[in-house]
C-alpha cells in the first residue's frame, strides 16, 4: 500500500530491477478484436491502450506470470479507443482501458457512462485531489496509473538550450515557422491536451476564447507537418524540425528505442526534453469498461498495475503514483517536484465537457481556414 502524499524533497534517482517471467501475450489486430465478441476464453483479459509498446508488453507478461491470466492487448490511439467504446457501448469487447494522454478522455467516457466504478481494496486511500492534481474520478470510475506532463523535445546540436522557446507563448512566434511538429489532434490525446491547455491559458473570465484560438492559429502556421508515423522526436533528433510536442513518457520511450543503457548520454546529445512553466501536468488513468466480458480479470489487471511490481514497470517511462520511486531514468534534473511546480491549473471538468468541441473547432476554424 502506497502513501500518496508527495514529498517536497528531491527524489533520489536509483535503478529499479524488475524480474519478468516468460508469459504468453497476445497482441491482436483490430479485425480479430471485433470478430471475437464475448464468446471468449474466460482465462483472459482484453486491454485497450495507447501505452508505449515495450511497457505494455512488460506489464502484460508480468501480470500473466503472476496470475496465469492471458492478456489480449489492442494497441491504438486514444481517440480511436474512445470511439470504439462509444460504438461498443451495448456490447463491449474490451475489459480495461489504460492511458489516454492523461485522464481527460476518461472523464469524457465517465460522462457518457462507458466506465464502471471500482475501488481497489489495497488502494482505497487514494484521494480525489492532491493539490491542483486530480487523482481519480469521484465515483472511482477511473484511477491514477501514473503522472504525466507535456513539454517539448529539442535538439541541442541544432538549437542550444539558450535559444529554445522557454514559454508556450513563444511557440507562436514567426521565428518557429516550419519548425514545430506534433500529432494530428484528430487521432492524438497528446495534441488534444495541448489544444485544451492553450485555450484555458488564454481564456478570459467571461469565457471569451478568441485569444486562445488566435494563438493556436499561429502555432498551426508554424507546424512543419503532423507526425504520421512514429514520434515527433524522430524528426527533432534528425534535425528536420526543431520542436516536437511530447509527454515525457513518449520522449523516454524514444530514447529507449535508440540506445542501450551505456549509450544514453550519446543519444541525449541529439535530443532533450523541456518542461515550460504553466505546462499540463495530470494523472494518466486506468479504468474498468462498463459491462465488460471479463470484469473480475479486469479488476485483477487494475490491481496489478497499481501494485508495487506494476508501478516499477510503469516507472520506466513515467512518474509513478508511488512517491517512493525515483524519476524515470533519462530526465536528468526533472523530478516530481519540478512537475508540480510548473503545473498549469487546469479545469479538467471543462476540458472533458468541451473535448469534442475543441477538436472540431480546430478542424473547422484552424485547419480548414488555413490550408
What are these regions (language model features)?
Residues 153-158, 196-200, 282-294, 313-317:
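A bilobed periplasmic-binding-protein/Venus flytrap-type ligand-binding module shared by bacterial periplasmic
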Residues 30-107, 371:
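Early extracytoplasmic/lumenal segment of secretory-pathway proteins
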Residues 320-371:
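An extracytoplasmic/periplasmic, membrane-proximal ligand-sensing/linker region
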Residues 1-44, 370-371:
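Short, low-complexity disordered leader/linker segments with a strong preference
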Residues 50-57, 80, 93-240, 254:
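Extracytoplasmic ligand-binding site segments that recognize negatively charged/polar headgroups
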